[in-house]
Swiss-Prot record:
EC id: 3.4.22.-
Job of this protein: Cysteine protease that cleaves specifically after arginine or lysine residues.
PTM field: Auto-proteolytic cleavage of the propeptide after Lys-55 and between the large and small subunits after Lys-268 is required for catalytic activity towards large protein substrates but is dispensable towards small oligopeptide substrates. After processing, the propeptide and the large and small subunits remain associated by non-covalent bonds. In vivo, the unprocessed enzyme appears to be the predominant form.
Name of the protein: Metacaspase-2
Temperature profile: Optimum temperature is 20-25 degrees Celsius.
Compartments, as annotated in UniProt: Recycling endosome
């Protein structure tokens, strides 16, 4: 199956990500995430240079679907297994396959996709997930975005922390680790925020999924989901402002695999989640894709609660987080394309 899909991509045809996602990784080995530990603060990202580099970049159409009239749908997928290093993982590229399969199955009409993975022969792969490539393709994702456009971002790999470079709210910055992080350094949350949001206009919808350790606030968004009585309690859920000065014009929602202080677990056999996939993969990705595929009318609040409940039933201690650029009305039906209804009582 995998070799056939690779041949189709090489011939310029479209990949069947649904088939690949549902039958992938039958020979994958189980893996456990080894925490990277505190990393040295990396050099700052030159945001202006990143956008200059992004001008000539293009993605590819991964599948055919009914388009959204007058709207562009663009997506960036990053999966890193760190092959041949002391940081090696086994399921992050599978997570990308699973997410692609889910979005194809749901019919999201992506006009342009970029896939940065370190797995050889990955169908539709754009390039390696180096620090430079991740930075410039983050800029590519949002460049020239206009009101009504829809963007999607998925990262599966190592997440870690470094001492804060001056964020007044946090002692540590959260980071993602590119495939070459040992040589080139990580990418911190401050720079992720600047790359994705500093030039994002109003009425652009962006959904992000981070399946990595220490990812709770990795986009530095101003609002987060809270529940009275604790994260796993049954109290009244609502959005709460946790940051000042980081407001974002677009409608951005992020689901992260765990809180800032937690690690994000991985599963030996994703078939136990009932998503149709097999082999190694991220627990949060598997739960989120299962929720998206099996529940057509979940609210934003229910999407998070049921993802948390599914992980808890499977014996995982991590608590996925939901954060956003606005105080989302948590009773609104979840959508990858629609603008938010906002709870005006929360400032």
């Amino acid at each position: 199956m995998c070799s056939l899909i690779t041949q189709l991509c090489d011939a310029g045809q479209l990949a069947d990500y649904v088939g690949l996602g549902w039958l992938n990784a039958v020979s994958s080995q189980p893996y456990l995430v080894q925490a990277l530990g505190l990393q040295p603060p990396p050099r700052r990202v030159d945001v202006d240079a990143a956008f200059r580099d992004a001008k000539g970049l293009h993605g590819h159409q991964p599948w055919v679907a009914t388009p959204l009239p007058g709207q562009t749908v663009r997506a960036l997928f990053i999966g890193i297994n760190y092959y041949g290093t002391s940081a090696a993982l086994s399921g992050c590229c599978n997570d990308v396959k699973q997410m692609l399969a889910t979005l194809q199955k749901k019919g999201l009409p992506i006009n342009e996709a970029v896939i940065l993975v370190d797995e050889d022969n990955f169908p539709g792969r754009t390039d390696q997930p180096t620090r430079d490539n991740i930075v410039r393709y983050m800029a590519w994702l949002v460049k020239d975005a206009k009101p009504g456009d829809v963007l999607f971002f998925h990262y599966s790999g190592h997440g870690t922390q470094c001492k804060s470079r001056g964020d007044s709210d946090e002692k540590y910055d959260q980071c993602i680790a590119p495939v070459d992080f040992q040589k080139s350094g990580c990418i911190v949350d401050d720079d992720i925020h600047k790359l994705l949001f500093s030039r994002l206009p109003e009425k652009v919808r962006l959904t992000a999924v981070f399946d990595c350790c220490h990812s709770g606030s990795i986009m530095d968004l101003p609002f987060t989901y809270v529940c009275s009585g604790g994260e796993q309690a049954s109290g009244t859920p609502h959005m709460k402002r946790i940051r000042e000065g980081n407001d974002v014009l677009g409608d951005v929602m992020m689901i992260s695999g765990c809180a800032d202080e937690q690690t994000s677990a991985d599963v030996k056999n994703t078939a136990t989640f009932g998503t149709g996939s097999t082999g190694a993969g991220g627990a949060a990705t598997q739960c989120i894709t299962c929720m998206l595929m099996n529940n057509q009318s979940l609210s934003y609040g229910k999407l998070l609660i049921e993802t948390r409940d599914m992980l808890k039933r499977k014996g995982f201690k991590q608590v996925p987080q939901l954060s956003a650029s606005k105080a989302i009305d948590l009773d609104q039906t979840f959508s990858l394309t629609e603008m938010f209804s906002v709870d005006r009582s929360i400032q």
